[in-house]
Amino acid sequence: GMQDNGSWVGPSAVWHAGGIRNEDWQEVLFGDGFDVQPTGDGEVYAMYQGGALNRVNLTTLGSTGIQPASPDTADLRFAWNAALALDPNDRDGLYFGSNRVHYSPNRGRTWETLSPDLTTNDPAKLEQATSGGLTIDATQAENHCTILCIAPSKVRPNELWVGTDDGRLQHSADRGETWTDHAGQLKGLP
């Protein structure tokens, strides 16, 4: 993705002389572009700020918004550049992060929530009463206490590692049934 210039896809190699050219690239989504993840079937996942996740058809460029909705009992907070990971054990599976881990077994058509809030949910960092949860900075666009990285295991299908922007490192060995916070337990890191 490119700041203020959308999400683009392009080849890693070409057959014509001169290497990869500007015309080899194609814009697939607008906004502040982030991840573009291929599905393998002529579609990609593309996202812009605030976790606005889309599934895009590369032939028609038609896009479908697939961001998980908030369950009745919880407000979701998405990072400016939300966590996105393809399931290495299921080609249709997709993990997505807010302050919770979400999983779709069918390319974003439906979602299940695999975790509680895995962040500190620190009111001082959230400042809900004064800012609605936005961290006041020059952009006025940053949510805090959000998941930044999701790493599903390639060899243990039920294992997940999750990192948050407020210092948590969460691990689940049972696909989100239980979570252990490893923050402060890694040698050489705060």
Question: Locations of the language-model features?
Answer:
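Beta-propeller blade termini and top-face loops
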Residues: 1-190
